[in-house]
């Protein structure tokens, strides 16, 4: 049996995205799961392919930026449908991360455009925590 964790990444900065992907590749090597990724780079894609698609409802993790180069916001994602416990907010603007918190998001990593590698490390660490078999084992014991 193949174990898969599905991750939705909403990020339009391709350099940041490449850093996150490089770190997720390392995470995948340390886990019993394959990582299945869906990457969207504009807010209209979120509306068309996620919010309005009844089949797009099974993500384990959502990595969520806020701003989109098209002038919209990735916060158009239907948080309630997917569950705020699955979301990692990664805006470089503290106010935008606070917006996500007000909607129930608990995991926030301030994007640091000066220290991109360190930022990507933090994202990968949070993903690792969220998919860790030990975490799943602990949840089942409660």
Per-segment meaning from a language model:
Residues 43-84, 94:
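Conserved phosphotransfer microenvironments
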Residues 11-12, 91:
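Conserved acidic carboxylate
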Residues 4:
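Phosphate-coordination loops involved in phosphoryl transfer and adenosine-cofactor binding
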Residues 37, 86-87:
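Hydrophobic/aromatic residues located in beta-strands of well-ordered beta-sheets
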Residues 92-113, 117-121:
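Alpha4 helix (beta4-alpha4-beta5 surface) of REC/receiver domains from two-component response regulators
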Residues 14-41:
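Two-component/phosphorelay signaling modules centered on CheY-like receiver
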Residues 118-142:
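CheY-like receiver
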């Amino acid at each position: 049996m193949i174990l898969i964790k599905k991750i939705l990444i909403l990020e339009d900065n391709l350099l940041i995205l490449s850093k996150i992907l490089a770190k997720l590749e390392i995470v995948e090597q340390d886990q019993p799961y394959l990582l299945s990724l869906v990457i969207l780079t504009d807010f209209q894609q979120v509306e068309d392919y996620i919010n309005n698609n009844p089949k797009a409802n099974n993500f384990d993790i959502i990595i969520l930026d806020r701003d989109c180069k098209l002038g919209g916001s990735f916060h158009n994602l239907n948080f309630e449908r997917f569950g705020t416990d699955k979301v990692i907010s990664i805006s470089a603007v503290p106010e935008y991360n606070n917006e996500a918190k007000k909607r129930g998001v608990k995991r926030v990593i301030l994007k640091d455009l000066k220290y991109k590698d360190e930022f990507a490390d933090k994202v990968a660490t949070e993903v690792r925590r969220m998919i860790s078999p030990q975490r799943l084992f602990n949840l089942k014991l409660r």
